[in-house]
Design a protein with these regions (language model features):
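PP2C/PPM-type serine/threonine phosphatase catalytic domain
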Residues: 1-246
Length: 246
């Protein structure tokens, strides 16, 4: 069984998108646009995250690696945009929608997970994530007079392997997909899997609320979220897969 809790932030439409197909599920956190959001007539990030989610549904299977599944989904959307957005190939990559993502695929004996950027997964008392993105968030937390300029500067370094501060993140050309973190763990004893965006991670700093397998649609969970909602203005999304009794 799959349950979802999602809530729009205060600054823009909800750019967290989630989905599942068969034994695979994901949460995508679209990056706030810093160089415009109207190549698709407005709300480009939200529309693009939904398009990637739809493409993932077409590509998921039990044969490919999760990074390959994501890569092909990204390339599908890129191909579509190349035909619908005038001068697409002349647009700097950092001006196009980008994202963080986490994906989980559940098999009979094991659970495969993939993370790119700062979304997270919680299973059986442990957090699984792409730690390489910590330095990017740390960079953006510098005390400077112009935060917006700092964030734009950071965004321009995405998927730049030649710059010492370059980093990998989800993008339409799929360049960063292979650099995401992916592992496989034994399924035994795991009864609940939680995937969530970085906004939700900010609220769930104390993961004890998840330890006993709480239902994310339970009023206890919702009350907890509302109690700590002040910690972030970002969108918050958590997707739960319950394995017990399957």
């Amino acid at each position: 069984m799959i349950e979802v809790f999602t809530q729009e932030g205060t600054k823009h439409v909800n750019q967290d998108i989630y989905g599942w197909q068969g034994n695979t599920m994901w949460v995508i956190d679209g990056a706030t646009p810093l160089f415009g959001d109207d190549l698709l007539g407005g709300n480009d990030v939200q529309k693009t995250m939904q398009n990637i989610s739809d493409a993932l549904k077409r590509h998921v299977d039990d044969k490919q690696s999760l990074s390959n599944v994501l890569y092909h989904a990204c390339k599908d959307v890129e191909s579509e945009y190349r035909h619908t957005i005038s001068g697409y190939d002349l647009i700097e990559k950092y001006k196009l929608p980008t994202f963080a993502i986490t994906i989980v695929r559940v098999n009979n004996m094991n659970i495969e997970w993939y993370g790119l950027g700062d979304c997270e997964i919680y299973m059986h008392g442990k957090v699984y994530r792409d730690e390489s993105f910590d330095r990017v968030n740390k960079r953006n937390q510098k005390e400077v007079s112009d935060k917006f300029a700092l964030h734009r500067e950071t965004r321009m370094l995405l998927n730049d392997k030649n710059h010492p501060e370059g980093y990998w993140i989800g993008s339409l050309d799929g360049a960063g997909c292979v650099y995401g973190k992916q592992e496989s763990i034994a399924r035994e004893d795991i009864e609940n899997i939680y995937l969530y965006s970085d906004g939700m991670s900010t609220i769930l700093q104390d993961k004890s609320i998840l330890m006993d397998g709480i239902d994310v649609n339970d009023s206890v969970f919702e009350n907890y979220i509302q109690k700590y909602r002040y910690l972030t203005t970002d969108d918050i999304t958590i997707l739960q897969m319950q394995l017990k009794g399957e």
